[in-house]
A protein has these predicted regions:
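C-terminal catalytic subdomain
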Residues: 2-5, 204-214, 273-328
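Sensory/regulatory domains in signal-transduction proteins
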Residues: 111, 120-129, 141-147, 229, ...
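Acidic loop->beta-strand submotif enriched in PP2C/PPM serine/threonine phosphatases
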Residues: 151-163, 218, 250-291
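N-terminal entry segment of metal-dependent catalytic domains or homologous docking segments
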Residues: 125-179, 183-189, 261-263, 267-269
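Bergerat-fold GHKL ATPase/HATPase_c domain
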Residues: 1-37, 141-160
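Catalytic core of PPM/PP2C metal-dependent serine/threonine phosphatase domains
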Residues: 179-246, 252, 265-266, 325-327
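Conserved beta-strand-loop-beta-strand hairpin that lines the nucleotide-binding pocket
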Residues: 1, 43-133, 161-169, 223-225, ...
Length: 328
């Protein structure tokens, strides 16, 4: 769930949407009250300090455990000293200065990326259980948004840990709306059922399985930490990037539409050193971005990386999804 927060009148709506989203996960009233407080303070800060921005709410299941994640993304002046801004009583807007302190107290994890002139991204996580499906040493973050005016997103992503490594899928159903969403969700279901297949057979299975749908652009990236290699197979315009030890490589996809036209299904391999960061996104984001434009961002939490790329490079005329994953 994400919603624009542009003025004080939208703070209560942001809180309502955050609580509504979290309630669907079965959380009790005490947990919902914590989420409401964090959402309120984040939305208020977006208006007071960021000149407006976006509030993003999602579930998470990774190295931190399982719970609800809230992010506030703005293009405001940014902060030169994040540590000072976290303290109760610090304010630059004539307010009591309790917002970040309240967010810190209600959150189990709080991470901020901010630079003067580059805006601010704040991630707060409320942990309500241990990690589930994913291996415990994986950090994951994602942001998705539907085509303007649509109620469903035509993109879908999935991540799973199998015998052959940690594997990420991003699928962008052709067009937008319910039929695009059906194609992307079908891809995610096939992926989850066959995640232990080698990458080329897996993508071939996806291609055949999407034939009854309108098709999709899709990509699969498998991070093999035993061999220190990323295996990548893509059909269509899903962008893939590997970052490791300061080296940035754009991964190669072949043209086509999974389910209809896929003249070549080929795996490309990319060795890495250190802790790799893999980023996949649909064409709802421009590819004209570079992490070097955000000093220090590459080492930050994947949710903040996904959030900032979404904030600054979303085209605004299509469904958009960006996912970042880092084995720890």
């Amino acid at each position: 769930m994400n919603t624009a927060i542009a003025d004080p009148s939208q703070v209560s709506e942001g809180r309502r949407l955050a609580v509504e989203f979290a309630r669907k996960t079965g959380l009790d009233d005490a947990k919902l009250a914590r989420i409401a407080l964090v959402a309120t303070e984040m939305a208020t800060n977006l208006v007071k300090h960021g000149g407006g921005g976006t509030l993003v709410v999602d579930r998470f299941d990774d190295a931190d455990g399982q719970g609800i994640e809230l992010m506030a993304l703005d293009r405001g002046a940014g902060m030169a000293d994040v540590g000072s801004c976290l303290a109760d009583g610090y304010s630059t807007a004539g307010s009591p200065g309790t917002g970040f302190g309240a967010i810190t107290r209600q959150s189990d994890r709080l991470v901020i990326f901010s630079r003067p002139g580059l805006g601010t991204a704040v991630m707060a996580r409320l942990i309500f259980g241990p990690a589930g499906k994913l291996p415990p040493r994986t950090a994951l973050g994602a942001v998705s948004a539907s085509y303007p005016g649509e109620t469903v997103c035509g993109d879908h992503w999935a991540f799973a840990a199998g015998r052959t490594g940690r594997t990420l899928l991003v699928a962008d159903g052709s067009g937008h709306g319910p039929e695009a969403a059906r194609a992307a969700l079908t891809a995610a279901q096939i992926f989850s059922d066959h995640v232990d297949d080698e990458c080329v057979p897996l993508v071939d299975r996806l291609h055949r399985g999407l034939a009854p749908t309108r098709g999709a652009a899709l990509a699969v990236a498998r991070i093999d930490t035993t061999e220190s290699i990323v295996r990548f197979v893509g059909i269509g315009n899903i962008a893939g990037t590997l970052v490791s030890d300061g080296d940035v490589r754009r991964m190669v996809s072949h043209n086509g539409i999974a389910g209809h036209v896929a003249p070549r299904i080929r795996e490309f391999t990319y060795p890495f050193t250190g802790e790799p960061l893999v980023i996949l996104h649909s064409d709802g984001l421009s590819t004209k971005w570079g992490l070097a434009d955000y000093p220090g961002l590459a080492a930050s939490h994947p949710s903040l990386i996904a959030g900032i790329l979404f904030r600054d490079h979303r085209r605004g005329r299509d469904d958009a999804t960006v996912v970042a994953v880092r084995p720890l």
